């Protein structure tokens, strides 16, 4: 930073003259020309790339839930809170931003916690051509609503029971556990959202 001004000398006598003449230390700054620090404009290409990456990650998570609903969860519908997969994708991008290979070095294990038991749903490798540098374990949580069990009770006794399976409702909360694979210390970060 370069500052110029009307002071010819910066010795203590010159400064004391200014202070005695009615200048206040706060007003000294207004007498100098100075460089303003300008925040750089965000790179539009980076913003578009990050948004595209986030949307691709959202699609991966939604496909994982869609594949798992009948095979591993045994239900006909999975109700996902609005913007849940978007929030998860943003957190995954944030956690991967400090990694050497970024999101490309991520392996994500997707689980569902039902009544304090974790059920494995899928394993997502973000880029198979890159050696993984960290693992993320995503744990979806089931919504604990009493009305869902009543609905299942009433529909399971009628003539509609053969065609209907239960509906799984996900909670808006989730857990992300990050484990670095290249660190000797084995750094683990747990985020509860």
Swiss-Prot record:
GO cellular component: cytoplasm
Domain of life assignment: Eukaryota
InterPro entries assigned: RTP801-like, RTP801-like_C_sf
GO BP term, pick one: negative regulation of signal transduction
Keyword Cytoplasm: yes
Pfam families (alphabetical): RTP801_C
Keywords tagged on the record: Cytoplasm
Keyword NAD carried by entry: no
Membrane-traversing stretches: none
Compartments reported by the entry: Cytoplasm
PANTHER family noted in UniProt: DNA DAMAGE-INDUCIBLE TRANSCRIPT 4-LIKE PROTEIN, DNA-DAMAGE-INDUCIBLE TRANSCRIPT 4 PROTEIN DDIT4
Family (UniProt): Belongs to the DDIT4 family.
Function statement: Inhibits cell growth by regulating the TOR signaling pathway upstream of the TSC1-TSC2 complex and downstream of AKT1.
Official protein name in the record: DNA damage-inducible transcript 4-like protein
Organism placement in taxonomy: Eukaryota, Metazoa, Chordata, Craniata, Vertebrata
